[in-house]
């Protein structure tokens, strides 16, 4: 299940040679190619499902643990100066679980490593290095900007929804993304799901509305954070299209990209943590954590792992489908995230049943709409491949 192609759209000349096109009857060759295409398509859909589950699970856990962290450190109290501290720590924790993905990479390569992967990666080292540096800087940028926007701007979640707009703009320019009515419908529904989901819940890190200057700074940080995140997704897709060697396993490429970019982002955030002096606040949080010191450490570890799992799923979806689909899946999970948030922390007392149900339906339909678009595209390519095989 090491998806070695971006999508199940064609059979390569090497694969044709392996099954003996020139030495077998046409009907046997056609049957072999069709069977190969069916297996490839099935594995591709399985990987789509797995990566989507990683995104949803990671987003749910990271949101719940982040709210738990804010409550237990006292950052949910309005007008408390502590509420605006610790942004560099948050951004560093968001990327710090790269040793986990590095272990997965070693495990994968020890089981499925090939010589062609190593030689191809070495030949394009310069381009790969530039790609990982760019992504690492963007990871660090949006992590820090989101951390500031989340704690300084009451409208953060509404600004966050513009992420889908920026992704669609960047992917059109950078990745030459083609749009159809199902993709557009999916974008509209996933945006509606996020909007209704925001209406139906709150959060422990929503700041006070009377902080004028902080509100303005937080809004701008949230805005530029969405730009940086959307740009990072599109650069990932460009990397898979133009930079990552086609001979390299897609699984290996996804994990390697996530590991290297997260490592660079962690180093940048670590420098920011010490330069800003925020490292001095860690001891206070550790000592005053309401549930005790062991749970403080465990909550940060769990939060970091949850964010890494979500990011790994996002990168996988970018590789398998597109940056836009990756963003849509994340947005469609918003209703589920907010429903679980309300159940876990009881942030909203008002009757918001209509908004929760509407958001959940919109999220499901938005995801289904994009999946149907992928299904139609895959079927069209299969038919084209079969007709081409018949003419051979």
Swiss-Prot record:
| Ranges of biased composition (kind: Basic and acidic residues) | 1-16
| UniProt modified residues of type Phosphoserine | 30
Q: Record's GO cellular component, any one?
A: membrane
Q: Which UniProt keywords apply?
A: Membrane, Phosphoprotein, Transmembrane, Transmembrane helix, Transport
Pfam families per UniProt:
PUNUT (PF16913)
What is its membrane topology? Answer: Multi-pass membrane protein
Chain ranges passing through the membrane: 46-66, 88-108, 128-148, 154-174, 182-202, 220-240, 254-274, 300-320, 325-345, 354-374
Where mainly located? membrane
As given in the record, the signal peptide range reads: none
Q: Where is this region: Disordered?
A: 1-29
Q: Where in the cell is it found?
A: Membrane
Entries under InterPro entries matching the protein:
PUP_plant (IPR030182)
Disulphide connectivity of cysteines: none
Q: Single GO molecular-function term? A: purine nucleoside transmembrane transporter activity
Could you tell me the superkingdom of the organism this chain comes from? Eukaryota
Give the protein family.
Answer: Belongs to the purine permeases (TC 2.A.7.14) family.
Protein name according to UniProt: Putative purine permease 19
Classification of source organism = Eukaryota, Viridiplantae, Streptophyta, Embryophyta, Tracheophyta
């Amino acid at each position: 299940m090491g998806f070695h192609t971006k999508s199940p759209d064609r059979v390569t000349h090497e694969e044709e040679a392996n099954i003996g096109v020139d030495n077998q009857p046409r009907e046997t060759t056609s049957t072999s190619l069709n069977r190969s295409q069916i297996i490839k398509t099935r594995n591709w859909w399985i990987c789509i499902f797995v990566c989507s589950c990683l995104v949803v699970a990671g987003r749910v856990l990271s949101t719940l643990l982040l709210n738990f962290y804010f409550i237990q450190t006292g950052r949910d109290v309005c007008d408390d100066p502590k509420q605006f501290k610790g942004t560099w720590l948050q951004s560093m924790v968001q990327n710090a679980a790269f040793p986990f993905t590095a272990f997965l990479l070693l495990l994968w390569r020890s089981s499925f490593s090939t010589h062609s992967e190593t030689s191809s990666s070495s030949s394009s080292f310069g381009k790969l290095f530039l790609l990982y540096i760019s992504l690492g800087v963007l990871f660090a940028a949006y992590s820090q900007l989101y951390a500031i926007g989340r704690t300084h701007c009451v409208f953060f979640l509404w600004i966050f929804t513009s992420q889908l707009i920026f992704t669609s703009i960047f992917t059109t320019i950078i990745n030459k993304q083609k749009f159809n009515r199902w993709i557009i419908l999916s974008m509209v529904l996933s945006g509606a799901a996020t909007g209704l989901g925001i209406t139906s819940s709150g959060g422990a890190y929503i700041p006070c509305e009377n902080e004028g200057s902080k509100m303005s700074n937080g809004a701008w940080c949230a805005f530029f954070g969405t730009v940086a995140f959307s740009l990072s997704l599109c650069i990932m897709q460009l990397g898979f299209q133009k930079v990552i060697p086609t001979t390299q396993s897609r699984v290996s490429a996804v994990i390697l990209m996530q590991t290297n970019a997260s490592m660079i982002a962690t180093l940048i955030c670590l420098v920011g943590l010490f330069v800003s002096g925020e490292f001095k606040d860690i001891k206070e949080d550790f000592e005053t954590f309401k549930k005790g010191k062991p749970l403080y450490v465990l909550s940060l570890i769990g939060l970091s792992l949850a964010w890494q799992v979500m990011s790994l799923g996002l990168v996988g979806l970018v590789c398998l489908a597109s940056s836009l689909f990756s963003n849509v899946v994340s947005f469609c999970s918003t209703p589920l995230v907010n429903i679980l948030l309300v159940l876990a922390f009881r942030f909203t007392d008002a009757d918001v049943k209509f908004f929760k149900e509407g958001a959940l339906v919109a999220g499901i339909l938005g995801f289904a709409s994009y999946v149907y678009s992928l299904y139609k595209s895959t079927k069209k390519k299969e038919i084209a491949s079969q007709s081409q095989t018949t003419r051979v």
